[in-house]
């Protein structure tokens, strides 16, 4: 426990310095996954360490063997993510072959490979993380001029996170501070990427307007078919809280085509203390195949909100649930799939449901099949 709580400004400054460490080695589009991954590892380990200390105090009367059995049983940790030995920040371990493995904070060589093993271990120990980490974050990949990042750079980044705050809620100025800091990182990388950053981030002011139009309420199901980093779903829950409701009494659903962005979204939900929502974020092409199903068909929701990718192509022969597009099919080529997203959103509404979306102005004026769909 620290005397002075960590403020959002302090945590943002800390994360800025993380980016500085990597900035000289590669473009921001290449290193964003590394900072997201490192932050996630540190947060999970810090939470785990806190729960582990509580278990040790609670069971201090037991023998060493009995206590260790409890400490290594992931069922002992309740809602806290279980961090296996391979992924622990502060504690090394000796394996069955009597080989000692350093804690993350003490990594010195083959660091990219070791960090990948840590990610894989924590994913394999927590079902909700299946497919999120090891398939989408690769600390050992080549960047820039086809070179792997040097151990010295990884060591600097690890040392920076090790010198920073312990990332547990009790140390935060407000409960959702880490989630807010994660949103700050997402905006930082979107701004750095310029126009391309729009694939995973929509400005907060725009999201806020859409959410105010939708007016989500407790007990509803809210869906974003092009979820990106998840900001629209998160703001929907926050809106309910601002209206005096319980943000955990809204079910959030999303789907994202890009693998790394999908992983960023799932981690975003977890860092906003909403693991249920993380489990409801699917990875896949929404136009081709909506993955949220109910009674053998695509699921319907009380509220649908999205900023679909503008001007995309699609392949009609691959499309499932064609009944979603009752107004007609837009051209497959020429980057004119915008009204396909609109129709999917309409088809995904429950009776008396409401949707809000962002579209390029071309959908209002283009002729051909798009004109027929509008009519």
Feature locations, PLM:
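Conserved S-adenosyl-L-methionine
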Residues: 196-306, 311-318, 326-328, 339-340, ...
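Non-catalytic, mostly N-terminal accessory regions of nucleic-acid modification and defense proteins
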Residues: 1-218, 277-286, 291
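Gly-rich Lys/Arg/Thr-decorated short loops/hinges at beta-loop-alpha junctions or inter-strand turns
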Residues: 188-191, 320-326
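Aromatic-residue hotspot detector
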Residues: 40, 48, 81, 232, ...
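Conserved Class I SAM-dependent methyltransferase catalytic core
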Residues: 14, 21, 30-43, 210, ...
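A generic secondary-structure signal for well-formed alpha-helical elements
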Residues: 42-55, 189, 240, 244, ...
């Amino acid at each position: 426990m620290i005397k002075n709580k960590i403020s959002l400004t302090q945590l943002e400054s800390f994360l800025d310095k993380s980016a500085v460490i990597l900035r000289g080695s590669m473009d921001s589009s290449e290193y964003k996954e590394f900072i997201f991954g490192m932050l996630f590892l540190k947060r999970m380990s810090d939470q785990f360490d806190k729960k582990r200390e509580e278990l040790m105090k609670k069971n201090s009367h037991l023998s060493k063997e009995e206590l260790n059995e409890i400490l290594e049983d992931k069922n002992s940790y309740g809602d806290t993510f279980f961090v296996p030995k391979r992924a622990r920040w502060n504690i090394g371990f000796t394996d069955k072959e009597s080989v000692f493995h350093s804690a993350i904070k003490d990594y010195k060589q083959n660091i990219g490979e070791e960090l990948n093993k840590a990610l894989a271990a924590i994913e394999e120990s927590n079902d909700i993380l299946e497919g999120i980490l090891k398939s989408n974050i690769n600390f050992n990949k080549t960047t820039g001029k086809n070179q792997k990042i040097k151990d010295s750079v990884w060591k600097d980044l690890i040392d920076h996170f090790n010198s920073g705050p312990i990332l547990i809620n009790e140390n935060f100025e407000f409960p959702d501070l880490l989630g807010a800091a994660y949103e700050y990182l997402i905006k930082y990388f979107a701004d750095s990427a310029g126009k391309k950053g729009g694939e995973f981030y929509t400005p907060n002011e725009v999201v806020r307007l859409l959410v105010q139009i939708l007016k989500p309420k407790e007990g509803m199901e809210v869906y974003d078919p092009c979820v990106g980093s998840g900001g629209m779903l998160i703001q929907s829950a926050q809106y309910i809280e601002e209206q005096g409701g319980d943000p955990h009494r809204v079910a959030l659903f999303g789907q994202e085509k890009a693998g790394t962005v999908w992983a960023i979204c799932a981690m975003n939900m977890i860092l906003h203390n909403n693991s249920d929502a993380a489990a409801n974020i699917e990875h896949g092409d929404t136009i081709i195949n909506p993955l949220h199903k109910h009674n053998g068909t695509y699921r319907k929701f009380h509220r649908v909100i999205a900023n679909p990718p503008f001007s995309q192509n699609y392949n009609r022969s691959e499309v499932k649930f064609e009944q979603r597009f009752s107004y007609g099919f837009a051209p497959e080529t020429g980057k004119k799939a915008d009204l396909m997203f609109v129709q999917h959103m309409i088809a995904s509404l429950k009776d008396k449901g409401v949707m809000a979306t962002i579209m390029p102005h071309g959908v209002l004026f283009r002729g051909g099949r798009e004109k027929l769909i509008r009519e």
